[in-house]
Amino acid sequence: VELSYLKPSEQKEFLEAIAGLQAIESGSITLLDDNGKGTELAGMDSISINKAGISLAFVPEDRIGMGLVGDMDMTDNMMLRSYRNGKSPFLDRKGPKALALKIKEQPEVMTPSISAPVRQMSGGNVQKVLVGREIAQNPKVLLVAFPTRGVDVNTSHVIYRLLNEQKKKGVAVVCVIEDLDVVLELCDRIAVFCGGKISGIEDGRTATKEEIGLLMTKHEKGGTLA
């Protein structure tokens, strides 16, 4: 699902609300399992979502800062995602190191060593590390904000391929993408917002730029993102 025509602050807040990082003033956020049973996420923070066994991953717009810690190496950044699941009082670096090595090979992160601070990497390689780490959690829901902003063309194709692979596995990928051509090619459904409300939800396989453009200028239709 692609979210179109939200203001930058709204895009950030919308995804953060689903991830439990932003409180909502009204409404609901319901996650349906394979049997159609709903779990209400509104009012739950990210720790509560994790403890509830809800498999949700988030690739934020802010790669260095909110997503990764720039002064840490790849292994330590993998540990940011795994330390809560440890049963021992001692931190286990074997699993995170193995994951770091795996991500270095695929999606082919260009770095002299997994021990190098991620801040020394290019923007594209930083994004590969972040996306690779989140996908490795085998999420049911993957939230992605501007996955290819500021990266080169080759890295963009790698990121789109990774997102497509997740979609084919049955993962619910909810993303914000700036390029409408990519949106129409990549997404099954497109939710268009106008004035902070959903003005329409279109089938990505049949929607046109003209239809999306019309929805960007009105908000009478309304809708529920499901």
Question: Over which residues does each language-model region extend?
Answer:
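Glycine-rich phosphate-binding loops of nucleotide-dependent enzymes
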Residues: 1-226
